[in-house]
């Protein structure tokens, strides 16, 4: 047990010793803390020990170990440890190590101080060198001070010499500049004699370079003297230089005029040619060579001299006057040459186009256009700058054209000729030629505008006379009023010309191709039938009423020839007279045939009129101003009543009130031609609808009117005698013998017979006159609605006036659905005649063996049964609308405003306004 306890105590002691040894180098609280330098040395020793190994011989030198961490703390010396060696006998214990460590540490410290000792020696050496250098610098500074004093003395002497030299040089330069300025100024005064001598020299040529230099010197000297008028004798020398300039201008004027005169003489009197100017006019090339060849040759001589003057126009007014004189002389010479030639040429053109005013105008104006262009081109071969005198000269040439054409224009009576001349002047001349070359044709444009205004004035005057004579005072012949015979004749001619050729199938095997071809041919027949339904043959050939055709032709002529305000006034008058003429013709046709024919005639031509004036892009509204004197009468009557206040001094002076209240008022009225056409069309449509309803259900309308008057009389009687009001008093209609069920039944049967008999005639007339399905439908719709409303009104009267069920059965009054079916069946019967054309065309088409071809042909050719079904279906929706619109108003009161508003511009009139 003692041994065990002893062992445990020893182990406990060893554990404590180990713990204490571990606490020597504890990171948190070490018992023996080492410095950084000591830790570094220990690391070095550890590395050396690790590298040497336990079997390292005693006398060997360990391998040099590099420090692992080169970034030591500041101030720690970095020394090589190559020469540090362990003791020969090695390190046996801790004491040996500590002794060896003390020696090594002392040696290391000594080695570290050696560097500082060496550096101290170097500093002491540098200090000695600096002391020696300071001594030498002090000696050099003493010498530099002496040298600076000497330099300052020399600098002062040199500066004084330079100042004196500069003053002398400045004075010399001033004197030299003064001398040069005097010479320069005297130069402008000393040139006058030299210039006079040169200008008086007989050998001086205007086209030479010496003459150019003379002009340059004259301009230069004259400009200088004018800029310095205060110089001595400046006015005298100004006069002298003006004289020199006048001499030079005279030389230029004489030279240019002589060259131009020679060209004029050679043109008017050619020496080496046997032909004169009149014979030369027959050939254009010869005429151009005669009238422009000599001048083009002279232009080369004159151009160089003229350029001398043109470049100096801004220097002096003398040059401007000289240039004006030269241009005037040139234009005068050209006028003497060209005026007779132009006059003779226009006379020849007038003779060649005698009686043809349009060709005369076109040829004469075209000739003047070429003359103006050639004259401007020739003018700019002489002169570079334009001149207003050229325009005056060309206007003189163009005046010959004006004087020649105006006598013809003021005697032309045909509107077509005047309109054609307007087009020639406005479009061909002004818009085409003048706009392409406005500068050369400015004078021609002025004369052409004057001619155009004269033609327009004559055109307006003749248009007024034409409207009065051929439209207002037009007396139609029997052929003009032959309606509907004329339309029927044109329709029969059109049907005979539209007979299609039969189709043949080339091969029975190509059944598919033949079926497709049959479908295409069927479509073409259907399209031709549709076109036939939309276009009246009379409209296609322009066979309108003469006044309508003349009005539209007149307006189309005036539209492109006169200004918009003038056209608006003329169109207002023309449309007004045309409407009156159509209304007059419609009345005569209605008196000769039937009112329906007259009204359809008027509707047809009013629609044509409205369609044809639509392309005119102009406002047909005209403003008229008038004076309203209505207040003058009232004011005068008030003045007579207030005679005692005529001279009253107060505010109620009668005379002042008369002057203030009796002033006539200016009123402006806007007249719209298009609205006038629509207003007349509305009136005619109302009349036509009323007459058509009376024609179809006249007995029923008469009965309803009579019934209304009877019921109104009974109502007034009942209101005057209240005691007589009994339930039977309201059955006065039933008690009337003419309103018995039998009489009403006969009226209804007669009305139905009239519908069946006359509806086809009515629709045939509408198709013949209007030839437009949409227009026919729009006009026929209120007729149909009025008929249905009349029967609905009759049914309401019978129901509310004591008629029993038996009476209703006796009367056999049809319902709205029955009336609609009746009208539809009658419409189908009326359409049979129209559909005969398509049926005949369909029969001529060869049937195909394929089912597809037959089906396609069946789809394209509509039969009468299909039409009936379509009509029944289309009328079903209209019945409800008719019932809702049914009212006790008279049958003839239809909303014709909607009819006119819905009327489309008919496509039947294909002839354009042109």
From Swiss-Prot:
It is a peripheral membrane protein. Component of the conserved oligomeric Golgi complex which is composed of eight different subunits and is required for normal Golgi morphology and localization. PANTHER family: CONSERVED OLIGOMERIC GOLGI COMPLEX COMPONENT 3 (PTHR13302), CONSERVED OLIGOMERIC GOLGI COMPLEX SUBUNIT 3 (PTHR13302:SF8). GO terms for biological process: endoplasmic reticulum to Golgi vesicle-mediated transport; Golgi organization; intra-Golgi vesicle-mediated transport; intracellular protein transport. Residues 874-883 have a biased composition (Basic and acidic residues). One of its GO terms (cellular component) is cis-Golgi network. The gene is Cog3. Residues 53-84, 874-914 are annotated as: Disordered. Belongs to the COG3 family. The keyword Protein transport applies. Residues 53-64, 884-897 have a biased composition (Low complexity). Keywords: Golgi apparatus, Membrane, Protein transport, Transport. This is Conserved oligomeric Golgi complex subunit 3. InterPro entries: COG3_C, COG3_N, COG_su3. It is found in: Golgi apparatus membrane. It comes from Drosophila pseudoobscura pseudoobscura (Fruit fly). The keyword Chaperone does not apply. Involved in ER-Golgi transport.
């Amino acid at each position: 047990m003692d041994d065990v306890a002893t062992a445990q105590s020893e182990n406990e002691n060893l554990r404590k010793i180990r713990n204490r040894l571990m606490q020597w180098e504890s990171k948190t609280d070490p018992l023996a803390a080492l410095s950084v330098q000591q830790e570094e040395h220990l690391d070095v020793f550890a590395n050396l020990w690790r590298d040497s190994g336990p079997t390292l011989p005693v006398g060997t030198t360990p391998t040099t170990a590099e420090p692992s961490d080169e970034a030591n703390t500041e101030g720690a010396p970095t020394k090589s440890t190559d020469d540090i060696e362990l003791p020969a006998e090695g390190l046996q214990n801790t004491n040996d190590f500590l002794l060896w460590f003390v020696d090594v540490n002392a040696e290391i410290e000594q080695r570290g101080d050696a560097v500082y000792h060496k550096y101290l020696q170097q500093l002491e050496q540098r200090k000695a060198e600096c002391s020696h250098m300071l001594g030498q610098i002090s000696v050099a500074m003493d010498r530099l001070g002496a040298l600076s004093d000497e330099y300052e003395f020399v600098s002062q002497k040199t500066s004084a010499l330079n100042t004196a030299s500069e003053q002398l040089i400045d004075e010399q330069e001033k004197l030299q500049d003064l001398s040069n300025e005097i010479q320069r100024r005297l130069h402008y005064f000393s040139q006058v004699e030299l210039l006079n001598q040169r200008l008086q020299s007989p050998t001086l040529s205007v086209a030479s370079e010496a003459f150019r230099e003379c002009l340059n010197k004259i301009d230069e000297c004259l400009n200088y003297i004018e800029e310095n008028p205060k110089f001595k004798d400046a006015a005298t020398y100004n006069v002298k230089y003006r004289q020199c300039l006048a001499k030079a201008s005279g030389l230029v004027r004489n030279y240019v005029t002589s060259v131009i005169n020679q060209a004029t003489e050679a043109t008017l009197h050619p020496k080496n040619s046997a032909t004169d100017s009149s014979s030369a006019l027959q050939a254009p090339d010869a005429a151009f060579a005669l009238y422009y060849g000599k001048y083009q040759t002279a232009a080369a001589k004159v151009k160089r001299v003229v350029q001398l003057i043109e470049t100096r126009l801004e220097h002096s007014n003398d040059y401007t006057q000289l240039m004006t004189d030269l241009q005037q002389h040139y234009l005068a010479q050209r006028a003497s040459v060209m005026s007779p030639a132009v006059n003779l040429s226009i006379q020849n053109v007038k003779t060649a186009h005698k009686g043809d005013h349009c060709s005369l105008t076109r040829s004469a104006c075209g000739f003047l256009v070429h003359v103006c262009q050639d004259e401007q081109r020739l003018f700019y071969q002489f002169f570079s700058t334009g001149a207003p005198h050229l325009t005056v000269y060309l206007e003189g040439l163009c005046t010959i054209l004006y004087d020649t054409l105006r006598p013809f224009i003021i005697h032309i009576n045909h509107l077509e000729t005047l309109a054609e001349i307007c087009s020639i002047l406005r479009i061909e001349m002004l818009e085409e030629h003048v706009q392409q070359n406005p500068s050369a044709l400015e004078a021609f444009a002025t004369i052409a505008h004057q001619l155009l205004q004269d033609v327009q004035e004559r055109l307006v005057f003749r248009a007024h006379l034409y409207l009065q004579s051929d439209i207002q005072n037009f007396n139609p012949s029997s052929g003009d009023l032959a309606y509907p015979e004329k339309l029927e004749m044109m329709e029969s001619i059109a049907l005979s010309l539209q007979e299609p050729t039969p189709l043949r199938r080339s091969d029975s095997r190509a059944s598919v191709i033949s079926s497709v071809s049959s479908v295409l041919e069927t479509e073409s027949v259907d399209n031709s039938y549709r076109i036939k339904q939309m276009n009246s043959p009379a409209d296609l050939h322009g066979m309108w009423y003469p006044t309508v055709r003349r009005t539209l032709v007149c307006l189309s002529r005036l539209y492109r020839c006169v200004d918009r305000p003038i056209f608006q006034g003329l169109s207002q008058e023309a449309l007004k007279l045309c409407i009156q003429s159509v209304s007059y013709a419609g009345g005569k046709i209605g008196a000769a045939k039937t009112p329906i024919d007259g009204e359809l005639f008027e509707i047809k031509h009013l629609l044509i009129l409205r369609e044809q004036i639509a392309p005119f892009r102009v406002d047909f509204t005209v403003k008229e101003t008038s004076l309203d004197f209505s207040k003058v009468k009232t004011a005068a009557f008030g003045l007579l009543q207030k005679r005692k206040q005529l001279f009253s001094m107060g505010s109620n002076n009668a005379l002042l009130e008369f002057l203030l209240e009796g002033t006539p008022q200016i009123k402006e009225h806007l007249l719209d031609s298009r609205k006038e056409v629509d207003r007349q069309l509305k009136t005619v449509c109302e009349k036509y609808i009323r007459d058509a309803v009376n024609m179809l259900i006249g007995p029923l309308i008469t009965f309803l009117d009579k019934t209304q008057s009877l019921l109104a009389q009974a109502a007034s009687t009942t209101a005057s005698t209240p005691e007589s009001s009994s339930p039977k008093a309201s059955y006065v209609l039933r008690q009337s013998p003419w309103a018995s069920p039998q009489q009403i039944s006969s009226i209804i049967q007669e009305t139905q017979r009239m519908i069946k008999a006359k509806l086809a005639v009515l629709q045939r007339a509408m198709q013949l006159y209007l030839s437009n399905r949409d227009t026919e439908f729009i006009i026929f719709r209120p007729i149909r609605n009025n008929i249905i409303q009349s029967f609905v009104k009759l049914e309401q009267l019978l129901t509310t006036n004591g008629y029993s069920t038996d009476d209703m059965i006796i009367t056999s009054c049809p319902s709205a659905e029955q009336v609609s079916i009746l009208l539809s069946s009658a419409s189908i019967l009326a359409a049979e005649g129209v559909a005969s054309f398509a049926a005949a065309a369909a029969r001529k088409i060869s049937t195909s063996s394929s089912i597809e071809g037959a089906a396609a042909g069946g789809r394209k050719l509509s039969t009468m049964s299909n039409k009936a079904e379509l009509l029944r279906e289309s009328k079903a929706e209209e019945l409800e609308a008719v019932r809702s619109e049914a009212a006790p108003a008279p049958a003839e009161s239809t909303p014709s405003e909607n009819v006119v508003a819905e009327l489309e511009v008919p496509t039947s009139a294909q002839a354009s306004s042109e």
